[in-house]
């Protein structure tokens, strides 16, 4: 269950932040929350769970998600990462370049097919 894992990760990050209040802790795991990730991140930052929201795979699928969030807009669901992990499969191959096979398929699907199948 992905949401159980996300909850476990975020509460663990919150414990680390509480234990080290002078160290800015960056979250992880927000990609699983898709278009709701910005709202969850904002609430967690407000409540002191972590200092900054970290987006990894999401930025490969949706490179301008930070701009969307800062503009006060909800991220577009059809641009969000679907957490398929194909980007990490490509990255782990020799000479692999991470990218979103789903959202940028014109570029990364041929690479994925060549290197991962």
Q: Residues of each region from the PLM?
A:
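Flavin-dependent oxidoreductase catalytic cores
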Residues: 1-117
């Amino acid at each position: 269950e992905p949401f159980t894992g996300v909850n476990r990760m975020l509460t663990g990050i919150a414990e680390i932040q509480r234990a080290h209040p002078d160290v800015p802790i960056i979250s992880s795991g927000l990609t699983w929350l898709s278009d709701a990730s910005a709202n969850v991140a904002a609430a967690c930052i407000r409540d002191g769970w972590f200092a900054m929201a970290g987006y990894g795979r999401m930025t490969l699928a949706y490179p301008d998600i930070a701009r969307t969030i800062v503009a006060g807009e909800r991220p577009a669901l059809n641009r969000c990462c679907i957490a398929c992990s194909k980007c990490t499969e490509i990255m782990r191959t020799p000479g692999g370049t991470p990218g979103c096979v789903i959202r940028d398929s014109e570029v990364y699907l041929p690479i994925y097919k060549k290197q991962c199948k």
